[in-house]
Amino acid sequence: MNVLSYPPILDAISLVHLRKEVEYFYPLGYNKWIGKYDEPENTVERYILDSFDFLLSSQYPTAVGFEWWIENLDGHNTITLHSNHDDNYRKENGTLKYPLLSTELYLTNDIDPTTILDTKQGKYWEQYENNPPTEVVFSAPEEGKFIVSDPRYMRGVFGRCSSRTTLCYDVWDYKPKNLNRVGIVTKPFDVRFYKQEPSSPVQWLGKTKKMQLSINDQQFFKKFPNKYREGETWKVTQ
C-alpha cells in the first residue's frame, strides 16, 4: 500500500506551540487553504509550508498549495470512511478529482488508530476499486508522528470520544474552489524539524479482532491487531 510513516518530525517545543494554536483554531468550520508561495500568517501555515519543503517538495514539484483541516474526536467517536477529493468539483461535474498526496500529523498520544483501507474511490462517487479491501493499515497516534498516503484510499477513525487531535493537509496541483486562508494572524513560531526517514507499515502476524464496516452498502469485516502501542503502524492482510 502507498502509505508511509515518519517517526516524530517535530521537537517538543515546536509541538507544544503548534498544538496550542490548533486548539485555538478549532473548530474551523470549513477546510482552509495556504498557497505554496504565500507568506505564513500563523504557526499552522508555517508548519504546513515548512514540512512540505523539508520532507516532500522534491517528490511533488507540480504542487501549488495545500488544503488543510483539523480532526478531533472530542464529543464523538467516529470519522466515517472517506477518500480525500475535491468535493465542490464532484458536486458541479459529477466526477472526482484528487490531490497529489494526503498527510496527517498526530498532536496527541492515543490508542485509536487511523484506519486506511486499500479500497480506492474511483472517478465516480459510487465507484470503488478493490472493494472489499484485501489489506488495511492501522496507524496508532503518537505526538509528532507524520503519515502520508494515497488520497484515494478509504480511511476513517473508529474509537471513543477523546481528545485525539490531528492536523491534516492535502497537496494539490491546482486550487479547488471555495477554499480560503484561515485569516487568523498570530506570530508564527519557527517550527523545528527532525530529519526522519519514512518506513512502510509492518506486516502484522499476531492475533486479530474483527469489526464490521460497509462501503457503498457492501458490508465486510475488517481484521485489526488485538493489541498495539502508541506510534506503531501495522498492515493487516484481510
Q: Model-derived features: where do they sit?
A:
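Generic cytosolic/nucleocytoplasmic N-terminal low-complexity/intrinsically disordered segments
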Residues: 1, 144, 206-208
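Non-heme Fe(II)/2-oxoglutarate
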Residues: 1-69, 76-79, 184-190, 229-237
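Selective for proline/serine-rich intrinsically disordered segments
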Residues: 5, 25, 38, 139, ...
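Catalytic core of non-heme Fe(II) oxygenases with the double-stranded beta-helix
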Residues: 62-191
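Double-stranded beta-helix
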Residues: 115-117, 163-212, 219-224, 228-237
